Amino acid sequence: MIQLDGISKVYKIRSGYMKYHDLYALDNISTTFRNNIISGITGASGSGKTTLANIITGYDTDYAGQILYNNSPVRTAGYVRYVFQDPYISMNPVKTVEWHLATAASINNVEMSDAIKKLEIAGMDYSIYKDRYGHSLSGGELQKLALAISIIPEPEFIVLDEAFSMMDSITLFKTLNFLKQLKKTISIIYIDHDINRIAFASDYVYILNHGKIIEENYTDKIMNDPLNDFTKELIKYSPDYHRRI
């Protein structure tokens, strides 16, 4: 369980000569992300989704407030893993898939055979991909590789920040269904700007706007009976894939 207590992130923005004003990327966020569910976070661009992900995973430590991991302020090694938006940054283009797996396995003291299993269940055939270099993989393939690497150490939580944005619709559908199985052993925080993807995969949804969680509830409640006007707008102007099908 991850508990946020009064999390704020403020940037000083210059507004004139020797003048600055505060810009709240996150504004006093207090909530809980529970175990063994998919917690979906969505909202407008610039609403603070990635900033929140950076703080939860420890990549940004310059913030106000407190985070508790299983009721402790200390994040133990391996507790949470982060899958970034851009796999071209996180994956080495001149190293093979096998190298990426072996490196992750070595760092986390995991047998290579177990790392290969993670790649397979993430949807990549090791025998086909092991000798492929990073630069030869598509964006969607790199995103599957990044997902596989994130679960090699079997963390308690993974944070997925727009982690499937380069996948085709078939691969995306399979990956989101994979997450529904994965949550039985690894709790998931899934961030996406598309509320329909969030609704398809998530058990519980958080709506961010201007650095605040303006609404949170179980997915069916959010989609069928939203309370906040911004949430209603998000749903109204999002393509309804179910009706198209």
Which residues make up each language-model segment?
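Conserved ABC transporter NBD signature motif
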Residues: A64-G78
